[in-house]
Amino acid sequence: MPIQKCKPTSPGRRFVEKVVHDHLHKGAPYAPLVEAKKRTGGRNNNGHITTRHVGGGHKQHYRIVDFKRNKDGVPAVVERIEYDPNRTAHIALLKYADGERRYIIAPKGLRAGDKVQSGNDAPIRPGNCLPLRNMPIGSTLHNVELKIGKGAQLARSAGASVQLLGRDGSYAIIRLRSGEMRKVHVECRAVIGEVSNQENNLRSLGKAGAARWRGVRPTVRGMAMNPIDHPHGGGEGRNKGIQPVSPWGQKAKGYKTRTNKRTTKMIIRDRRVK
């Protein structure tokens, strides 16, 4: 899709660069698959901030997306491709042969009128969902399950994909965009192709207000704070004084935070290894 630069009719428009998507549906979403989305403002049930830089923004409705793709053997036709404010990828509205409609993450190149299918005998075509044991070696995949039947957890954002490198017994070996190589059970499902809207990282919001519309609040540097507010605060001039840490003192660079030893054995190659 082309990148459109806006004319500098105002300071806020001068740096705006947006991706043009002519194939997206212009109307409202499919109402039966839409539900209310309550905002948290980054607070938990006690009212304490647990996620900083979150709050405000335009009201959004949540689109119920099918990540399990468990309607096997029933062909579906893509009715339309839609924008989803809750994710960077686009979504596709499917109409199955029995009349049911579901949203899925739209793969790259999928358009209205295309046919998709899920199941063991689904053809190898972008948008089709199969178990990893039925995928050709070297395939580009997205929406990969980590647990059988749980639903897709890997490679769900715009432009994301993984590559199937091989199979070893009851496990498939995949490589993520980060460089990590890991084992996933061959009965876990994945979708052929990569996720749509791969130009998402090329856009420029152009002004702070565009981020506020999306519910993103300002990020204040620790060095700009007082000593009471952050370990980097205070001092004369721009003086950090210590190695980079979080507001609560945890090391920000090189410190491993992963503690799930149960699934560490599934990681063949760490993403930090160059």
UniProtKB/Swiss-Prot annotation:
Signal peptide limits: none
Any one GO molecular-function label of the UniProt entry: structural constituent of ribosome
Region annotated Disordered, chain positions: 38-57, 224-256
Gene3D superfamilies, sorted: 2.30.30.30, Nucleic acid-binding proteins, Ribosomal protein L2, domain 3
Gene Ontology CC annotations of this record: large ribosomal subunit
Protein name as it appears in the record: Large ribosomal subunit protein uL2
Any matching Pfam family: Ribosomal_L2
Organism: Acinetobacter baumannii (strain AB0057)
Protein encoded by which gene: rplB
Alphabetical UniProt keywords: Ribonucleoprotein, Ribosomal protein, RNA-binding, rRNA-binding
